[in-house]
Amino acid sequence: MLTNKQKYNNAFIESFSINENVLGNDISYNSIPEWDSIGHMSLIAVLEEVFDIMMEMDDIIDFSSYKKGFEIIGKYGVKF
């Protein structure tokens, strides 16, 4: 069974078609070509499905980095 962090990482890997070694606290919106507005909505959709949550619009907008995402997803009761 995957941990929540593995599920979180897999959402990025699946949404952006990137390798896990690209992930880290410095990855953020528009820091890689794949994380544009279309990629952002894909990521949000995958995260909502994987964690069975529905994010508020403010949280979708504030989801600006890999690191910030942990905080935002945590607001919905997901523990990392």
Predicted features by range, described:
Residues 2-35, 39-45, 50-80:
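Phosphopantetheine-dependent thiolation modules in NRPS/PKS and related acyl-activating systems
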